[in-house]
């Protein structure tokens, strides 16, 4: 974190990042604990939505964001192809169980394991020690992150190929065989990917991402800093604050893209599960508005699940952008206390 040259800076209890900034073991503990919170929220929310589900009202007009995602993945259908919520409770309970496992692992890493990863029962554990100004260390850790993301993409593609996902064009769950190596499709959808209307193209894109991420991960793990570590390459800038700002920038980008995609694409976000496509409007601030009849929407203040999902993602992305700018400027050395002092000076001169 930025200290502005003060080696003895202290942080308030609310600055949680300060506890894990230079403690790789605790950093892992916080990540695993956060995963546990996400798992618990997912399982609990899924059970809550299932308990309130009314089959006489379209799913997209209920408070059913989690059920909508499961239905899109082809989960919850009976043998006749009708969505009944079959197996959804089991998935939710598994999430609750795993949330306890993740929570216990997070506490173990925080309380019992080496907080700095200087030593451990597994060899080479010190390679994952956090050295924020060491490009070799950061690129090594980045490589592993990319490989895990690539594996997740493969898992999704194989799920669609083996189990199948919901195809709104047919109104049923079907298996999707991606075009492995179809780079022409990816190139052709660079600027109109939001309008994709083929699940084969969607899965091909994920297969391409898996290839790209795993290749990039292997490259980052195998390579080291090339040439002299100059200011152009990040010397003096590379820090925990800078990495945090880049992470927030990534969340901003993904949030905005997801918002625009979910608002208009009915292939990946079917109307049956999320409600009608949205319209982008301007008021006090930009927002997404429903375009269909919402008289039967009892939740989300009378809006569809699509409207709730998109607007929350859109505004979370906006605040991630503000966080990115804040931490990026701090990483560059800008002291925001100067603004408060300048305002205080103007106030004093005005009053005098």
From Swiss-Prot:
Query: What cofactor requirement does the entry state?
Result: divinyl chlorophyll a; divinyl chlorophyll b
What do the Gene Ontology cellular component annotations say?
photosystem I; photosystem II; plasma membrane-derived thylakoid membrane
Q: What is its main location?
A: membrane
Annotated localization? Cellular thylakoid membrane
Q: Which UniProt keywords apply?
A: Chlorophyll, Chromophore, Membrane, Photosynthesis, Photosystem I, Photosystem II, Thylakoid, Transmembrane, Transmembrane helix
Q: What quaternary structure, including any partners, is listed in this protein's UniProt entry?
A: The antenna complex consists of divinyl chlorophylls (a and b) and divinyl chlorophyll a/b binding proteins and binds more divinyl chlorophyll b than does the antenna complex from high-light-adapted Prochlorococcus.
According to its UniProt entry, the function of this protein is described as:
The antenna complex functions as a light receptor, it captures and delivers excitation energy to photosystems II and I. The Prochlorales pcb genes are not related to higher plant LHCs.
Anything else known: This low-light-adapted strain contains 8 pcb genes.
Record's family? Belongs to the PsbB/PsbC family. IsiA/Pcb subfamily.
**What is this protein called in UniProt?**
Divinyl chlorophyll a/b light-harvesting protein PcbH
């Amino acid at each position: 974190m930025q200290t502005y040259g003060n080696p003895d800076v202290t942080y308030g209890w609310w600055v949680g990042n300060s506890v894990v900034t230079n403690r790789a073991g605790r950093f892992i503990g916080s990540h695993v604990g956060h995963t546990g919170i996400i798992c618990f929220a997912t399982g609990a929310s899924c059970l809550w939505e299932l308990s309130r589900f009314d089959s006489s009202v379209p799913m997209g007009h209920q408070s059913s964001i989690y059920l909508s995602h499961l239905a899109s993945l082809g989960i919850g259908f009976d043998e006749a192809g009708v969505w009944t919520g079959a197996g959804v409770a089991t998935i939710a309970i598994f999430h609750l169980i795993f949330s306890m496992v993740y929570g216990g692992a997070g506490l173990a890493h925080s309380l019992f394991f080496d907080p700095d990863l200087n030593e451990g029962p597994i060899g080479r554990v010190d390679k994952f020690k956090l050295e924020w100004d060491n490009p070799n260390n950061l690129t090594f850790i980045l490589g592993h992150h990319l490989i895990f993301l690539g594996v997740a993409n493969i898992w999704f593609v194989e799920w669609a190929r083996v189990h199948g996902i919901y195809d709104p064009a047919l109104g049923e769950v079907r298996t999707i065989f991606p075009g492995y190596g179809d780079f022409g499709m990816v190139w052709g959808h660079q600027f109109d990917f939001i309008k994709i209307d083929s699940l084969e193209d969607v899965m091909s894109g994920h297969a391409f991402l898996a290839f790209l991420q795993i290749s990039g991960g292997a490259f980052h793990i195998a390579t080291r800093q090339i040439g002299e570590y100059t200011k152009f390459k990040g010397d003096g800038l590379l820090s925990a604050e800078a990495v945090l700002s880049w992470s927030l920038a990534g969340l901003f980008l993904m949030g905005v893209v997801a918002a625009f995609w979910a608002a208009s694409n009915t292939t990946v976000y079917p109307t049956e599960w999320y409600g009608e496509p949205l319209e982008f409007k301007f008021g006090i601030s930009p927002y997404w508005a429903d375009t269909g009849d919402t008289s039967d929407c009892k939740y989300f203040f009378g809006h569809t699940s699509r409207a709730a999902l998109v607007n929350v993602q859109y505004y979370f992305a906006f605040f991630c952008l503000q966080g990115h700018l804040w931490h990026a400027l701090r990483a560059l050395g800008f002291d925001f206390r100067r603004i408060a002092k300048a305002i205080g000076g103007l106030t004093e001169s005005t009053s005098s």
